[in-house]
Amino acid sequence: MNSLLMIIGCLVLIGTVWTKEGYLVNMKTGCKYGCYELGDNGYCDRKCKAESGNYGYCYTVGCWCEGLPNSKPTWPLPGKSCSGK
């Protein structure tokens, strides 16, 4: 029983360590996805889940996503500024 609890605990920890969070970024413009309804926000949550994240919400006028795979880029993109187009 103790071994099972240790294995489950390790799996939870691995899931936490191997994910990241950050502002969702539009790869074409280099800008973060904007939002105006702070807190729980259906638009941001849908965008986050479309990028394989766990949960998205509006934070300081941008869609913040938690639980993203490490392979997904977040704002700001290195070497690319927001063009606003």
UniProtKB/Swiss-Prot annotation:
Family assignment from sequence similarity: Belongs to the long (4 C-C) scorpion toxin superfamily. Sodium channel inhibitor family. Beta subfamily.
Sequence positions bearing Serine amide: S83
Keyword Cell cycle part of the UniProt annotation: no
GO biological process: defense response
Pfam families: Toxin_3
UniProt GO cellular component terms: extracellular region
Disulfide bonds: C31-C82, C35-C58, C44-C63, C48-C65
InterPro entries named among the record's database cross-references: LCN-type_CS_alpha_beta_dom, Scorpion_toxin-like, Scorpion_toxin-like_sf, Scorpion_toxinL, Scorpion_toxinL/defensin
Organism field: Centruroides limpidus
Signal sequence interval, chain numbering: 1-19
Protein name: Toxin Cll6
Family annotation (CDD domains): neurotoxins_LC_scorpion (cd23106)
Domain statement: Has the structural arrangement of an alpha-helix connected to antiparallel beta-sheets by disulfide bonds (CS-alpha/beta).
Known role: Beta toxins bind voltage-independently at site-4 of sodium channels (Nav) and shift the voltage of activation toward more negative potentials thereby affecting sodium channel activation and promoting spontaneous and repetitive firing.
